[in-house]
């Protein structure tokens, strides 16, 4: 079981500083689902050389990071996050990209777990390094060239899951107004 929480703190409307990233580790250590560990998307599972936040690292590096966290072929992994499932969903996709399918997302996440008064603990649990069978799926994430092709392909749909004000170009939160042409907002 892994807590995957990351917090984005929006400080102002300056598009050059859209948000500050904070690891959820401190809240995890204060109170977590019993027997869970923590996966830090920003510090441990992103490409540190990229100028962009949360960039997917090379798949070999990502697989090695998961292996070091104790994720391996002998286990089923349950992911959860606080205040929504976006962070656990992101890591679920990352696991699939390196060929790991034995993962689920906790319905309702940590917030629902607490509301149900289910067991929680304090502290930081770590798991031993595990055997991880690396089987990359290069088609799970696409690059800008694939997106350009999809924009001109009537059989492809590009979905944007950001808020409608960002999608419609009314909120400069990410520094550049607008959306990918032909994308639909959900």
Give the label of every model feature segment.
Residues 1-186:
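Cytosolic catalytic domains that perform sulfur/thiol-centered chemistry
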């Amino acid at each position: 079981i892994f807590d995957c929480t990351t917090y984005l703190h929006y400080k102002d409307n300056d598009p050059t500083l859209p948000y500050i990233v904070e690891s959820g580790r401190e809240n995890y250590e204060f109170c977590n689902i019993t027997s869970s560990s923590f996966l830090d998307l920003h510090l441990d599972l992103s490409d540190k050389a990229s100028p962009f936040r949360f960039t997917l690292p090379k798949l070999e590096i990502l697989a090695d990071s998961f292996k070091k966290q104790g994720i391996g072929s002998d286990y089923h992994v349950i992911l959860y996050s606080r205040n929504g499932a976006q962070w656990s969903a992101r890591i679920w996709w990352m696991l699939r990209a390196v060929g790991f399918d034995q993962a689920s997302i906790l319905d309702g996440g940590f917030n629902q777990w607490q509301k149900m008064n289910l067991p929680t603990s304090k502290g930081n649990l770590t798991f031993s390094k595990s055997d991880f069978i690396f089987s990359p799926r290069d088609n799970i994430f696409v690059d800008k060239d694939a997106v350009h092709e999809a924009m001109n392909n009537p059989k492809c749909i590009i979905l944007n899951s950001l808020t409608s004000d960002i999608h419609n170009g009314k909120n400069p939160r990410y520094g550049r107004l607008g959306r990918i042409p032909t994308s639909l907002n959900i």
